[in-house]
Amino acid sequence: MDILKSEILRKRQLVEDRNLLVENKKYFKRSELAKKEEEAYFERCGYKIQPKEEDQKPLTSSNPVLELELAEEKLPMTLSRQEVIRRLRERGEPIRLFGETDYDAFQRLRKIEILTPEVNKGLRNDLKAALDKIDQQYLNEIVGGQEPGEEDTQNDLKVHEENTTIEELEALGESLGKGDDHKDMDIITKFLKFLLGVWAKELNAREDYVKRSVQGKLNSATQKQTESYLRPLFRKLRKRNLPADIKESITDIIKFMLQREYVKANDAYLQMAIGNAPWPIGVTMVGIHARTGREKIFSKHVAHVLNDETQRKYIQGLKRLMTICQKHFPTDPSKCVEYNAL
């Protein structure tokens, strides 16, 4: 019995020496006792205990959200509230959550931009974007200043210099549709860029107060929007991968425009954009025989304006250039479309 009491006393003394029990604590972990014994053993052997690397270095996480949350208190608010609202709306996010301050909304925007840097910009108001760009150019001019007597060309539109005349293009137009697709695509590209240049020169020749008016800004934005709409068409023409049915229709349109047959060009445009056969409604494939409506589904008869957004845009841009061509290179009223409206 005395041996048991002495052993209990020794264990109790060992726990007290190791300082394992703190105030108001009646138990300790076995791992803490083992760690204390290990330290005592190394001290008796003369080894110097070095802290582990995990204790020296802070715990890092591969999660960018956690890292951002740890450091977000140090970040100043570098964007205005209006810019934060605009960027959040672009990404379809609420501009303010319940109980959120302006700084919290800014931090939330930063997290969204880090996690999803790419934003879907497919469907948006292109005309408004062009107007905003023109307004920004005018604002930059006001901030930057201008020397007296200096010509104001900062806000002029880009002019495509094709180094050609309408007479040369009309001569080239006689060879359109003769079977040489590559030559036809080159003529189409040259003529459309020529019309864009004519349009830009007309807008650049306006007085400065006209350029700064609401209607003047709208006209400039329309020209820029048309140029951006036609870029996919120019790319397809350059790479020679324009679909055959689209190429055939555009060739007819350009040929009639060069002949100043604007009514025929408009008819060819409507044939391409709208088509002359509606898409059949209802079931067209029942059994082993196709129904009568199925025969009308053909690429030549279907509206290309409904195919995709890119085609719709450059078809719309082509129609605007048809109007510009009729305005600058007029002909008999019987061959024009809406002659009195121009």
From Swiss-Prot:
Keyword Nucleus appears in the UniProt entry: yes
Major localization listed first in the record, in broad terms: nucleus
Entries under InterPro entries matching the protein: Prp18, PRP4-like, PRP4-like_sf, PRPF18
Segments traversing the membrane: none
An annotated GO cellular component: spliceosomal complex
One BP annotation, GO: generation of catalytic spliceosome for second transesterification step
N-acetylmethionine modification, residue list: 1
Subcellular location: Nucleus speckle
Pfam family name, one: PRP4
Alphabetically ordered keywords of this record: Acetylation, mRNA processing, mRNA splicing, Nucleus, Spliceosome
Entry superkingdom: Eukaryota
Keyword field contains Manganese: no
SMART domains according to UniProt: SFM
Role summary: Participates in the second step of pre-mRNA splicing.
Family: Belongs to the PRP18 family.
Quaternary structure (record): Heterodimer with PPIH. Interacts with PRPF4 and with the spliceosome. Part of a complex containing U4/U6 snRNPs.
Identification of the protein by name: Pre-mRNA-splicing factor 18
Species assigned in the record: Homo sapiens (Human)
Native organism taxonomy: Eukaryota, Metazoa, Chordata, Craniata, Vertebrata
